[in-house]
Curated annotation (Swiss-Prot):
The gene is gh. Zn(2+) binds at residues 19, 169. Disulfide bonds join 52-160, 177-185. The modification Pyrrolidone carboxylic acid is found at residue 1. This is Somatotropin. Belongs to the somatotropin/prolactin family. CDD domains: somatotropin_like (cd10285). GO terms for biological process: animal organ development; growth hormone receptor signaling pathway; positive regulation of growth; positive regulation of receptor signaling pathway via JAK-STAT; response to nutrient levels. It is found in: Secreted. GO terms for cellular component: extracellular space. GO terms for molecular function: growth hormone activity; growth hormone receptor binding; metal ion binding.
Amino acid sequence: QPITDSQRLFSIAVSRIQHLHLLAQRLFSDFESSLQTEEQRQLNKIFLQDFCNSDYIISPIDKHETQRSSVLKLLSISYRLVQSWEFPSRSLSGGSALRNQISPKLSELKTGIHLLIRANQDGAEMFADSSALQLAPYGNYYQSLGADESLRRSYELLACFKKDMHKVETYLTVAKCRLSPEANCTL
């Protein structure tokens, strides 16, 4: 059975998000390993109480809800999550070689997801509202901060980026699986 354009696009998108998720994990663990143990404990405590900017994007709350979500819904949420990182990704801490890869990869992924949404819409105009939700680019993140506050912000941004890339990877993998006739799509 020949591979359809949609399956090929999904394979590329899943491969790209897996790479971005690995980059996010690497940036986060590099940042964590640069911290003192006490600093790390404090940041972990603070982060557990904080929210990511993207938490305002309505998404499935668990794997069961993810499994029940339509392909189009998973694609739309993925698009919004990727879009929400286009600007903040330029401020991620970490090695510049890694950081410089992120913005273009996010942009390519966003384009790919947009094509997948169009291919899976079947005339439904569900995508129009996604541009209505423009998240603030991490609020007051860009103010000049003291050293401790700057450290906390870098930690939050990297942790949120890692979390969101994991979400997108999960959603795209489930959506891709749904379009594959012989697949078992359990998480």
